[in-house]
From Swiss-Prot:
<comment type="pathway">
    <text>Cell wall biogenesis; peptidoglycan biosynthesis.</text>
</comment>
<dbReference type="InterPro" id="IPR011761">
    <property type="entry name" value="ATP-grasp"/>
</dbReference>
<feature type="binding site">
    <location>
        <position position="269"/>
    </location>
    <ligand>
        <name>Mg(2+) 2</name>
    </ligand>
</feature>
<keyword id="KW-0573">Peptidoglycan synthesis</keyword>
<keyword id="KW-0067">ATP-binding</keyword>
<feature type="binding site">
    <location>
        <begin position="128"/>
        <end position="182"/>
    </location>
    <ligand>
        <name>ATP</name>
    </ligand>
</feature>
<dbReference type="InterPro" id="IPR011095">
    <property type="entry name" value="Dala_Dala_lig_C"/>
</dbReference>
<dbReference type="GO" id="GO:0005524">
    <property type="term" value="F:ATP binding"/>
</dbReference>
<dbReference type="InterPro" id="IPR000291">
    <property type="entry name" value="D-Ala_lig_Van_CS"/>
</dbReference>
<keyword id="KW-0464">Manganese</keyword>
<keyword id="KW-0460">Magnesium</keyword>
<dbReference type="InterPro" id="IPR016185">
    <property type="entry name" value="PreATP-grasp_dom_sf"/>
</dbReference>
<dbReference type="Pfam" id="PF01820">
    <property type="entry name" value="Dala_Dala_lig_N"/>
</dbReference>
<feature type="binding site">
    <location>
        <position position="267"/>
    </location>
    <ligand>
        <name>Mg(2+) 2</name>
    </ligand>
</feature>
<dbReference type="InterPro" id="IPR011127">
    <property type="entry name" value="Dala_Dala_lig_N"/>
</dbReference>
<dbReference type="InterPro" id="IPR005905">
    <property type="entry name" value="D_ala_D_ala"/>
</dbReference>
<feature type="binding site">
    <location>
        <position position="250"/>
    </location>
    <ligand>
        <name>Mg(2+) 1</name>
    </ligand>
</feature>
């Protein structure tokens, strides 16, 4: 009998639409290779829905809360449904940028400087010398991320709108010039390194998910030793945070500094996108792994107690 896979997608975070796209593509790929698939658009009754479905495996394709912060992982552990990607602790830790940076720095992984500020503090004036980056301490897909430039008298007013939904805690980091590099990890294997070039300057939400919004340059145009250093650090970050299954580490690289000193790890994404424009499927394809094989691997890798 074909394995029954519940594909978890949607949810209520600002990344809902990306999750629905990831889920739809993966569900289709699983059906094509013979799995029995139920698409679950996650709402607050998800525990009841999953208890009724009793799937063999849950493929977690949620982004943001509740799928990326340990919440859905805890529900699946209670229901004893094997699931993909990282477990409760690693998910919660990686979702909190400040705490994840502490862990990675302790493991010897270079991370950017900076500190946490509240929205109220940011509203009063510059919290770092410009240029610097302000982003929600929890969240992904570059949603709510702003670069504050030298010619701006104050941070972007979008941060202080009444309909802001990304929390009161912001991470302020110095802006690091240079290349945007990213590397996926698949189990204990680092995939290849992509250089991301945004068409309109900043690799924001629109650049990530709009057709033609960015270029994925694979392999990245860096020296071989930097390329291998990125792969090594991505795997080390995956392990330091306790990640499982698929993750993706994002880096900035200032090639004007000597001996690779310009390379820093910005963050680790435990639920990287799986849409038609996403990075991990591109990396896998470059390694000879088809999209169907990648999704099948995630299902077969699923366990409890992750």
């Amino acid at each position: 009998m074909a394995k029954h896979v519940a594909v978890l997608m949607g949810g209520w975070s600002p990344e809902r639409e990306v999750s629905l796209r990831s889920g739809a593509g993966c569900a289709k790929a699983l059906e094509e290779v013979g799995y029995r698939v139920t698409r679950v658009d996650v709402d607050r009754d998800v525990a009841e829905v999953l208890a009724r479905l009793k799937p063999d495996v849950a493929l977690n394709l949620l982004h943001g809360c509740p799928g990326e912060d340990g919440t859905i992982q805890g529900i699946l552990e209670i229901l004893r449904i094997p699931y993909s990607h990282s477990g409760v602790l690693a998910s919660a830790l990686a979702m909190d940028k400040a705490r994840a940076k502490v862990v990675m720095a302790a493991a010897g992984i270079p991370v950017p400087g900076g500190h946490l500020v509240t929205r109220a503090e940011a509203a009063k004036g510059h919290v770092l010398p410009p240029p610097y980056v302000l982003k929600p301490n929890t969240g992904g897909s570059s949603v709510g991320v702003f670069i504050v430039k030298e010619d701006q008298p104050h941070p972007p007013q979008e941060l202080f709108r009444a309909d802001w939904t990304f929390g009161e805690s912001l991470m302020a980091e110095p802006f690091i010039k240079g290349l945007e590099l990213t590397c996926g990890v698949m189990g204990d294997r680092a995939l290849d390194v992509i250089e991301v070039e945004a068409v309109h300057g900043f690799y924001d939400y629109e650049s990530k998910y709009a057709a033609g919004g960015s270029r994925h340059i694979l392999p990245a145009r860096v020296l071989p030793q930097i390329y291998q250093q990125v792969r090594m650090l991505a795997l080390e970050a995956h392990r330091a945070l306790g990640c499982r299954g698929i993750s993706r580490a994002d880096f900035r690289y200032d090639d004007t500094l000597p001996d690779g000193k310009g390379l820093v790890c910005l963050e680790v994404n435990t639920q990287p996108g799986m849409t038609e424009t996403s990075l991990v499927p591109d990396m896998a394809a470059h390694a000879g792994i088809s999209f169907g094989e990648l999704v099948t691997w995630m299902v077969e890798d699923a366990t409890l107690d992750r």
